[in-house]
A protein has these predicted regions:
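A short gly/proline-enriched turn/hairpin at secondary-structure junctions
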Residues: 31-34
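Conserved hydrophobic "DFG−1" position in protein kinase catalytic cores
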Residues: 11-12, 20, 93, 114
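Unchanged
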Residues: 37-128
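Short loop/turn segments immediately following the C-termini of beta-strands
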Residues: 23
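Charged phosphate-binding loop/patch that engages nucleotide di/tri-phosphates or the phosphate backbone
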Residues: 122-146
Length: 146
């Protein structure tokens, strides 16, 4: 079985804060904007589309400065998509340009907030994604999430 190609955005603003969004389908579950890439899209095209869809942010509102990945996780049984075993994610760190408005009132997220990376809690992430988030925080911020 294959892994579904996926991209995720870690958006930063001056002061070192990052944007996290609470999922609409799971209360108290926070994550970065992310989504699957279509076969005919580059990772950057997929990132721009997903960010626009999920937080209404146009590409000219941020600048990608770093990326790491891919990171893999396996879907829980019954949650497989498109015949895939799991997801293979590339994470992109981007800086806000100016003070863009973040809009999250949609099917993906119910709200958003800016936090310092060291205040992120692994319990906010569904168990299946926790190893990926631990690796992401280690790679981007040199933070070990317990």
């Amino acid at each position: 079985m294959k892994f579904r190609r996926n991209v995720a955005l870690i958006l930063t603003r001056p002061g070192g804060e990052i944007l996290v969004c609470e999922r609409s389908d799971f209360k108290d579950s926070w994550q970065f904007p992310q989504g699957g890439a279509k076969d005919d899209e580059s990772d950057i095209e997929a990132l721009q589309r997903e960010v626009r869809e999920e937080i209404a942010l146009p590409p000219e509102s941020y600048r990608v400065v770093l990326h790491h990945g891919p990171y893999r996780y396996i879907f829980r049984s019954g949650f497989r998509k498109e015949g895939c075993l799991g997801q293979e994610q590339t994470y992109y760190l981007a800086e806000c340009l100016g003070s863009p408005e973040i809009v999250v009132d949609n099917k993906e997220f119910r709200r958003s907030r800016w936090i310092k990376p060291e205040t992120f809690r692994i319990k906010w992430v569904p168990p299946v994604k926790r190893d990926v988030y631990r690796a992401v925080f280690r790679d981007f911020f040199r933070i070990e999430l317990a």
